[in-house]
Design a protein with these regions (language model features):
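Conserved catalytic core of sirtuin-type NAD+-dependent deacylases
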Residues: 1-280
Length: 280
């Protein structure tokens, strides 16, 4: 079965943003780097999930929520002031994420993981689409819409199911549960970011997909990898054009088209191999 959606193929063909020859050359160069890599680290942002129909935080809210901005709802202060409103917004986001399906870019990353010796997947997304596409050991820096944790900090965590539309209470202490995500103004879990940092330092190739490159500290990861000698491949990202150099390889076009193309060109004919196995 082809990884690429024909509808998206037509979108790329009709995009006037760049010379197709330049795009093909960039893809070939990036595929060559990926094929030679032993250790690959991937960072994904909202752009990869947008192609599955999940709005980004830059998109205006719709329906009942149109009167708010995400920045007004995704903060500890908003939860303190009106926990029910914040919970209902996250319940609607969780419902939208459950309906959404992984796209060809998510599936391409699952395939990529089976083709290299060492693979790390770091995401800023909270929709669990990577896991549903078959990716394992995903390092979700911003948490998950599919979980809630105790707002009082007692370490109570529950997986959310469809019936959790009303705000639940912690079974340990009875306090409110909150979405298990990182809100504006909160720090990333230190242990998780340290794992991401180590993956960036150790990799031969760093692939950034659908990221804005403005949300720190994750925005520093591509340049950290580059400073340690990695080739950085940038797919469908506003990072395009931010930095230039022989080790920065930009690929224009939708991630759901360009990422499958990249993986297919890099590993055509190569069998899946055991993680940590020697290079072919």
């Amino acid at each position: 079965m082809a990884l690429i959606d024909p509808t998206l193929e037509r979108r790329v063909a009709s995009t006037p943003a760049s010379d197709p020859r330049t795009r093909a050359e960039a893809l070939t160069t990036a595929a060559r780097a990926l094929r030679a890599a032993e250790n690959v680290c991937v960072l994904t942002g909202a752009g990869i999930s947008a192609e599955s129909g999940i709005p980004t935080f830059r998109d205006a809210l719709t329906g009942h929520w149109a009167q708010f901005s995400p920045a007004e709802l995704a903060t500890p202060e908003a939860f303190t002031a009106n926990p029910e409103r914040v919970w209902q917004w996250y319940a609607s986001r969780c419902g939208a994420a459950r309906v959404a399906q992984p796209n060809a870019a998510h599936r391409a990353l699952t395939l990529l993981a089976s083709r290299v010796s060492h693979f790390s997947l770091v995401t800023q997304n909270v929709d669990d689409l990577h896991e549903r596409a078959g990716s394992r050991d995903v390092l979700a820096l911003h948490g998950s819409l599919m979980r809630a944790r105790c707002s009082a900090g007692c370490d109570g965590v529950v997986a959310l199911s469809d019936e959790f539309t009303a705000m639940p209470r912690c079974v340990r202490c009875g306090d409110r549960l909150r979405p298990d995500v990182v809100w504006f103004g909160e720090q990333l879990p230190a242990a998780d970011f340290e794992l991401a940092r180590k993956a960036a330092v150790a990799c031969d190739v760093f692939v950034s997909v659908g990221t804005s490159n403005v949300v720190e500290p994750a925005a520093s990861l591509p340049w950290l990898a580059a400073s340690h000698g990695a080739t950085v491949i940038v797919v469908n990202s506003s990072m395009l054009g931010q930095r230039k150099g022989p080790s920065i390889l930009p690929i224009e076009g939708p991630a759901a088209v360009m990422l499958p193309r990249l993986v297919e060109e890099a590993f055509a004919g190569r069998r899946a191999r055991q993680r940590g196995a020697a290079s072919e």
